C-alpha cells in the first residue's frame, strides 16, 4: 500500500483535523527522510529511515531555529485561517535540539498576532526524558502524548522504538506530568492492541497518568503494514465507553463519519 509523502516544508496545511479543527502543522524534522524515535507499524508516512534518539549526526538536516520562527511569524501575520499551531510533522518534534526555545517563540508570536489561536503538540512521548522538553509542556495549550500499549512487549511490537527508549521510563514520565492529553491508535491484526488483557493493562496506566482526556482512533490512511486492520467506529465507541467506566477519565473516540 502506498503511504503518504513526507511534508516538504516547515509549515504544512492548514489541514482539517478531527480533533483540532483547522491545524497549521509545524514540521521540525528533515524534509527528505523520516527521522523519528519510533518506527510505528501504522505510520501513514511509512517506515522510519533513521530510528534514534540521538540526532547528533542529523542536526544539519533539521529546520534551523530562525527559519522556523520566520515561517511561523509570516503565517501569523497572513490572512490564513487556522485554529491551532501544531508541532507535529515527519517525526518526533521534541527531539529537535531547540524545541523548548521554539515553543517560547511560537507562543510569543501567537500572543502577539493570533491571540485566539491555540498551540498544540502531537508527541510520541519519548522526548520527555529531556528536562527542557518537560519544562516547556505547561506553555502549550494542548499537549498530546502517545500511549498505544498497556504492556512493554506490545509497545515494542507496535511502536518499534529506538533502542534507547524504554516503556517503563515513558510511563514514568507521563505520570510525572499534569494536565496533558493522551492519544492512542487502536488496530487489529498483527500486532493488535485491542485484546481484553491488553486493554485492561492500558486502562490501568490511563488511571495512573490521570490525563485531562484521551483521544482514541484507528487508521484511516495508507500504512506500511498490510497485516494490520482498522477498528470500526462502533468498536471505538464501545472501547471509549469501557475506558470511561474503568478509569473515570474522559475518553473520546475519533473517526471519519
Q: Which residues does each predicted region cover?
A:
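Conserved Radical SAM active-site core
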Residues: 42-139
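Conserved AdoMet/S-adenosylmethionine-binding subsite of the radical SAM
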Residues: 94-229
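Generic detector of contiguous secondary-structure segments
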Residues: 4-8, 27, 87-90, 166-171
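An N-terminal domain-start capping segment
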Residues: 29-36, 48-50, 94, 167-170
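Auxiliary Fe-S-binding modules of radical SAM enzymes
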Residues: 1-19, 30, 52, 70, ...
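N-terminal pre-triad scaffold of radical SAM enzymes
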Residues: 9-46, 84-86
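Residue-level signal for beta-strand positions within conserved beta-sheet cores that form or flank
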Residues: 22, 36, 115-117, 249
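Sterically constrained small-residue positions within well-ordered secondary structures
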Residues: 15-17, 34, 112, 136, ...
Amino acid at each position: 500500500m502506498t503511504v503518504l509523502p513526507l511534508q516538504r516544508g516547515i509549515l504544512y496545511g492548514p489541514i482539517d483535523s478531527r480533533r483540532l479543527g483547522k491545524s497549521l502543522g509545524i514540521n521540525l524534522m528533515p524534509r527528505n527522510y523520516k527521522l523519528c524515535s519510533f518506527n510505528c507499524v501504522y505510520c501513514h508516512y511509512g517506515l522510519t529511515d533513521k530510528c534514534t534518539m540521538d540526532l547528533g549526526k542529523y542536526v544539519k538536516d533539521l529546520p534551523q531555529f530562525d527559519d522556523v520562527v520566520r515561517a511561523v511569524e509570516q503565517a501569523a501575520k497572513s490572512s490564513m485561517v487556522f485554529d491551532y499551531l501544531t508541532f507535529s510533522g515527519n517525526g518526533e518534534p521534541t527531539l529537535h535540539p531547540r524545541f523548548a526555545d521554539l515553543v517560547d517563540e511560537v507562543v510569543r508570536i501567537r500572543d502577539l498576532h493570533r491571540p485566539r489561536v491555540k498551540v498544540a503538540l502531537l508527541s510520541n512521548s519519548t522526548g520527555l526524558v529531556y528536562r527542557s522538553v518537560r519544562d516547556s509542556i505547561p506553555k502549550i495549550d494542548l499537549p498530546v502524548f502517545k500511549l498505544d500499549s498497556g504492556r512493554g512487549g506490545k509497545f515494542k511490537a507496535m511502536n518499534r522504538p529506538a533502542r534507547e527508549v524504554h516503556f517503563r521510563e515513558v510511563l514514568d514520565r507521563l505520570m510525572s506530568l499534569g494536565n496533558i492529553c493522551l492519544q492512542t491508535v487502536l488496530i487489529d491484526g498483527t500486532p493488535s492492541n485491542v485484546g481484553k488483557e491488553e486493554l485492561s493493562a492500558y486502562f490501568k496506566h490511563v488511571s495512573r497518568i490521570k490525563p485531562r482526556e484521551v483521544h482514541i482512533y484507528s487508521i484511516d490512511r495508507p500504512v506500511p503494514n498490510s497485516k494490520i486492520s482498522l477498528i470500526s467506529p462502533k468498536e471505538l465507541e464501545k472501547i471509549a465507553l469501557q475506558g470511561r467506566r474503568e478509569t473515570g477519565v474522559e475518553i473520546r473516540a475519533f473517526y471519519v463519519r
